[in-house]
């Protein structure tokens, strides 16, 4: 199932991680995407400039025609991945059938994207 939300996330940042939490990557200025083995942060449109459209779903079901900015494995020990704000508000949630998933992230532009697509595939 593919889900989409439109939000203006606090701090213009979203996180993808296991619902049980993850080790958040340390901030690095001017980096759109940062990651650890258990969490990914993605910058988005400045919150005062409007909303960002965020889509989460199986890789085969999402639009992968954007700019690929992430392609790696994410630990999912609770078998549920979430997209959340820097304040911990869950925006999107998806059950997965494995404790590790391959994740691809696509954006519509490298600076302040207002469209972010997250595709996942079980390993």
Model-derived regions, located:
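Primarily secretory-pathway and cell-envelope proteins
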Residues: 1-67, 111-123
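Surface-exposed coil/turn segments at beta-strand junctions on protein surfaces, enriched
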Residues: 35, 76, 96-98
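Extended, solvent-exposed segments with strong compositional bias
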Residues: 63-94
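Generic hydrophobic/packing signal
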Residues: 87, 107-111
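Functionally constrained cores in energy, signaling, and assembly domains
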Residues: 93-95, 119-120
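A glycine-anchored, Pro-Gly-centered beta-turn/N-cap motif
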Residues: 97-106
């Amino acid at each position: 199932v593919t889900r989409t939300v439109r939000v203006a996330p606090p701090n213009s940042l979203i996180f993808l991680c296991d619902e049980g939490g993850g080790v958040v990557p340390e901030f690095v200025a001017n980096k759109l995407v940062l990651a650890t083995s258990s969490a990914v942060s993605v910058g988005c449109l400045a919150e005062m400039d409007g909303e960002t459209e965020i889509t989460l779903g199986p890789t085969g079901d999402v639009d992968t025609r954007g700019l690929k900015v992430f392609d790696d494995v994410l630990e999912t020990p609770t078998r549920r991945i979430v997209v959340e704000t820097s304040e911990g508000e869950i925006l999107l949630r998806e059950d997965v059938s494995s404790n590790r998933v391959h994740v691809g992230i696509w954006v519509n532009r490298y600076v302040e994207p207002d469209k972010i697509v997250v595709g996942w595939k079980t390993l």
